[in-house]
C-alpha cells in the first residue's frame, strides 16, 4: 500500500503537482514511518514549493533513519541553503560526501554553497545587508515597526502585499525573488535602517554611468554598492530528478533487470494457474516454485501453498505458508497477502483435525485483514471444536457415578447440588434420558417449572416411552396453571404408560395429577353463572376450537341422546382429552 502511494507521489512530482505529491507521500509515511526514501521525496516536494523549513525537517528525519545514505544529506544541504544557512548547508554536503565521495549532486551542491559564501564575503567590507533579514521578519515586533514607520505604514492596507509578506515570513529565502518590488525594498530599508529610495537613485545613476563605459573599472566604489545582493538562489530539485534516489547506471540497470525478472515470474505463475485449474497440481507446483525463485513476491508462495493443499501435501502447504508470512514481513508485503497465508494455515490445520491451531490462525488472519470467508470458517471451526469437546467429555462410567451421587443428594433434600450432579451426568452421557428426567424432578423441587419442562421434552425426545418424563411435564404445567396443556400431558402419559416397558405402573400418579387439574379448573368457575361461563368460553380459543370441530359436534350430539355413548368415545385418547377439557371448562356438566 505504501509503495503504491509512493508511486502516485512520484507521478504527481513529475507533473510538478507538488501539493498532491506531498499528500501522497504523507499518506505513505503514515503506513511506513521507517521508510527514509519517503521523507526524502517529501523533502524534495517541499523544496520545490520553496517551503525550506518543512524540507529541512524531512531531510533531517531521512538522515536520522539512514545516516549513510548520501541522498539524504543532499536534501538537507539544499534545504539549509534555501534557508540561507550556508555554513550548515556546507556541513551537510560534506557529511554526505563522507559516505559517497563521488556523488555528483553533493559535489555540485557544495560548490554552489562555497560560491555563495565567497560572494557574501566579497561584499563591501564583507558586509552582507540581507544576511539577518530572516530573523528580523520573524521578530514579534516586526508588524509594530512596519506600522510606526511613515514609509511602510501605508503597506498595511495593501492586502495583496501583506499576503506576499506573510509567505516570505514563513520562507525567508524567497525574499530574493521579490527584490524588484519597490514595496519590498521599502520594508528592507526599514529593517536595515537606511533610505532605500535614496540609495536606489544613486545606484541607478552610477549604474547608468557604468553602462556608458565599455570597460568599467573594478575599483569603482559605487558600482557594487548600488546593486542588491545577488546571492545564487537555493538549489531546488528538478522535476526530472529521480524521486527515490539518484540512479547510477548500475542502479538503472538493476531496476530494469528487476522489472524483467518480475515479468518472467508472472509468466511462470500464469502457466501454474492454468495447470492449477486443470488440477494438474505437480506441474502447477513446479511453476510456482520457478516464479518465486525468479522474483520474490509472496503471491507466488500463496499460490504454491494452495496447490500443495489441493494435492493433499499438507506438510509442504504449512511450511510454504509459514515462509510466505516470514518473507512477507521482510518484504513489507500487503497485509492482505499475509492474511491470506494465515487463513490458508487455518484451513490446513482444520483439514488435519487440529481445530485449536485452526482457530488460532483464523483469528490471526482476521487481525491482519477481515474477510467474510475467513470469519465464516472461524465460526465453523469453533462449532466443530465445541462439538469435539463435548464428544471427548463423554464417559458412561463417570455419568453413572454422577447419577448415583445426584440420587443420594435428592433423597437428602439437597436439590441444588443434585441438579449439579445430574447436569454432569447429561454432559458425560448426553444420550441417556435419565439424566434429563432426574434433573427435571429436581427442578420441580426448587420451583423451576420452565426448566423442568425443557428437560422433560429432551428426555421424551431421547426416549418417547419415558412415561415419568410426561408425568413430570404435567406437574410442571400444573404449577404454571396451564391446565389445558396439563390435561394433554396427563393423557399422553396415560397412553405411553400402557405400552411396554411401563405396563401401567404410573397410572395412579397420572390419574391423581389429572384429578388435581380438573379440580383446579372447577374451582376457578365455582359460583359462576351460565352467562359468565359462556363469556369465559368465548375467550378460550382452545375450547372454541373443540366446539367447532365437526367430529366433536357429532359426538356431543350423540351424548345428548345417549349419555352412555360418551363413555365409549372416551376410549379414544384424543377424544378423551377434548371431553375432559370441555368438562373442566364447564361446557359439559356432570351430575
From Swiss-Prot:
It is found in: Cytoplasm. Residues 245-255 have a biased composition (Basic and acidic residues). One of its GO terms (biological process) is protein folding. Residues 202-255 are annotated as: Disordered. Residues 215-225 have a biased composition (Low complexity). Its main location: cytoplasm. Residues 139-178, 530-569 form the STI1 domain. GO terms for cellular component: cytoplasm; cytosol; nucleus. One of its GO terms (molecular function) is ATPase inhibitor activity. It holds the Pfam family TPR_8. Keywords: Cytoplasm, Repeat, Stress response, TPR repeat. TPR repeats lie at residues 2-35, 36-69, 70-103, 265-298, 299-331, 339-372, 399-432, 433-466, 467-500. Part of a larger complex that includes HSP70, HSP90, and immunophilins. This is Heat shock protein sti1 homolog. The gene is sti1.
Amino acid at each position: 500500500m505504501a509503495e503504491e502511494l509512493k508511486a502516485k507521489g512520484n507521478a504527481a512530482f513529475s507533473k510538478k503537482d507538488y501539493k498532491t505529491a506531498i499528500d501522497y507521500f504523507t499518506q505513505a509515511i503514515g503506513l511506513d514511518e521507517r521508510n527514509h526514501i519517503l521523507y526524502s521525496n517529501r523533502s524534495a516536494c517541499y523544496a520545490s514549493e520553496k517551503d525550506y523549513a518543512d524540507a529541512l525537517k524531512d531531510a533531517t528525519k531521512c538522515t536520522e533513519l539512514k545516516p549513510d545514505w548520501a541522498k539524504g544529506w543532499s536534501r538537507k544541504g539544499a534545504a539549509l541553503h534555501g534557508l540561507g544557512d550556508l555554513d550548515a548547508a556546507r556541513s551537510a554536503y560534506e557529511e554526505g560526501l563522507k559516505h559517497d565521495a563521488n556523488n555528483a549532486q553533493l559535489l555540485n551542491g557544495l560548490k554552489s554553497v562555497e560560491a555563495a559564501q565567497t560572494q557574501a564575503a566579497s561584499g563591501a567590507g564583507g558586509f552582507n545587508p540581507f544576511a539577518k533579514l530572516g530573523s528580523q521578519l520573524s521578530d514579534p515586533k516586526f508588524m509594530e515597526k512596519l506600522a510606526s514607520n511613515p514609509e511602510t505604514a501605508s503597506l498595511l492596507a495593501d492586502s495583496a502585499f501583506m499576503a506576499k509578506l506573510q509567505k516570505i515570513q514563513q520562507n525567508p529565502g524567497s525574499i530574493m525573488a521579490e527584490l524588484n518590488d519597490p514595496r519590498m525594498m521599502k520594508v528592507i530599508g526599514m529593517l536595515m535602517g537606511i533610505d532605500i529610495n535614496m540609495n536606489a537613485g544613486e545606484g541607478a545613476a552610477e549604474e547608468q554611468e557604468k553602462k556608458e563605459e565599455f570597460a568599467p573599472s573594478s575599483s569603482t566604489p559605487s558600482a557594487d554598492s548600488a546593486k542588491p545582493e545577488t546571492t545564487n538562489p537555493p538549489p531546488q530539485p528538478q522535476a526530472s530528478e529521480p524521486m527515490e534516489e539518484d540512479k547510477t547506471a548500475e542502479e538503472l540497470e538493476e531496476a530494469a533487470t528487476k522489472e524483467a525478472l518480475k515479468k518472467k515470474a508472472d509468466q511462470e505463475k500464469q502457466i501454474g494457474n492454468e495447470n492449477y485449474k486443470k488440477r494438474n497440481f505437480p506441474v502447477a507446483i513446479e511453476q510456482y516454485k520457478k516464479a518465486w525463485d525468479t522474483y520474490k513476491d509472496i503471491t507466488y508462495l500463496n499460490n504454491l501453498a494452495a496447490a500443495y493443499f489441493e494435492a493433499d501435501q499438507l506438510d509442504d502447504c504449512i511450511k510454504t505458508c509459514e515462509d510466505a508470512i516470514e518473507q512477507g514481513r521482510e518484504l513489507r508485503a500487503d497485509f492482505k497477502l499475509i492474511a491470506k497465508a494465515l487463513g490458508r494455515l487455518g484451513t490446513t490445520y482444520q483439514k488435519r483435525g487440529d481445530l485449536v491451531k485452526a482457530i488460532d490462525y483464523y483469528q490471526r488472519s482476521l487481525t491482519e485483514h477481515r474477510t467474510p470467508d475467513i470469519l465464516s470458517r472461524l465460526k465453523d471451526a469453533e462449532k466443530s471444536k465445541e462439538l469435539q469437546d463435548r464428544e471427548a467429555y463423554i464417559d458412561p462410567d463417570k455419568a453413572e457415578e454422577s447419577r448415583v451421587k445426584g440420587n443420594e443428594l435428592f433423597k437428602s433434600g439437597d436439590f441444588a447440588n443434585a441438579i449439579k450432579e445430574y447436569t454432569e451426568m447429561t454432559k458425560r452421557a448426553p444420550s441417556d434420558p435419565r439424566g434429563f428426567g432426574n434433573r427435571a424432578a429436581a427442578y420441580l423441587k426448587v420451583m423451576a417449572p420452565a426448566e423442568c419442562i425443557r428437560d422433560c421434552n429432551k428426555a421424551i425426545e431421547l426416549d418417547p416411552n419415558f412415561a415419568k418424563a410426561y408425568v413430570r411435564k404435567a406437574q410442571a404445567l400444573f404449577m404454571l396453571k396451564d391446565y389445558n396443556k396439563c390435561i394433554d400431558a396427563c393423557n399422553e402419559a396415560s397412553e405411553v404408560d400402557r405400552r411396554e416397558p411401563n405396563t401401567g405402573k404410573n397410572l395412579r400418579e397420572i390419574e391423581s395429577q389429572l384429578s388435581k387439574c380438573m379440580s383446579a379448573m372447577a374451582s376457578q368457575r365455582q359460583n359462576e353463572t351460565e352467562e359468565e361461563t359462556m363469556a369465559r368460553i368465548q375467550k378460550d380459543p382452545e375450547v372454541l376450537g373443540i366446539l367447532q370441530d365437526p367430529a366433536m359436534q357429532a359426538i356431543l350430539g350423540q351424548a345428548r341422546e345417549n349419555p352412555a355413548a360418551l363413555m365409549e368415545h372416551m376410549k379414544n385418547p384424543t377424544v378423551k382429552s377434548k371431553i375432559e377439557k370441555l368438562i373442566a371448562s364447564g361446557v359439559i356438566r356432570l351430575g
